[in-house]
Amino acid sequence: MRHGFRGRRFNRTVEHRKAMFANMSAALIKHEQIITTLPKAKDLRPVVEKLITLGKRGDLHARRQAIAQIRDEAMVKKLFEVLGPRYQTRPGGYCRIMKAGFRYGDNAPMAVIEFVDRDVNARGQDSGPTQAAASQTEAA
């Protein structure tokens, strides 16, 4: 019986799972919407909701706890300066998971996880080297 065992293993070690959720949390904070598999989205939601609650608290200890979890100073800054004040009056339920069909190739169920009342302009913002190269060619 699996009573009392929370979460999924995803065929990864503990360290790999923690790193995966840290990276996914940072990506969700940065873009405010990401596409991933449905089980990963379901396990990511409580991680991100706890981070938003830390951002709402806003004290030094909460900031250090957030840094220990997501390890990205810029995303912690956004968490405490943008997302914390945005959800100050909301008592919970900061994330929404919407099913997004099935992935071509392995038919894995996909989902979109996003913040409720998200900033639509943050989507795709600074999406890595491909977008940086495109912006450099536009400037030239």
Curated annotation (Swiss-Prot):
Coiled coil: none annotated. Signal peptide: none annotated. One of its GO terms (biological process) is translation. Pfam families: Ribosomal_L17 (PF01196). InterPro entries: Ribosomal_bL17, Ribosomal_bL17_CS, Ribosomal_bL17_sf. The keyword Nucleus does not apply. One of its GO terms (cellular component) is cytosolic large ribosomal subunit. The keyword Ribosomal protein applies. Gene3D superfamilies: Ribosomal protein L17. Keywords: Ribonucleoprotein, Ribosomal protein. GO terms for molecular function: structural constituent of ribosome. PANTHER family: LARGE RIBOSOMAL SUBUNIT PROTEIN BL17M, RIBOSOMAL PROTEIN L17. Belongs to the bacterial ribosomal protein bL17 family. Part of the 50S ribosomal subunit. Contacts protein L32. This is Large ribosomal subunit protein bL17. The lineage of its organism: Bacteria, Pseudomonadati, Pseudomonadota, Alphaproteobacteria, Hyphomicrobiales. The gene is rplQ.
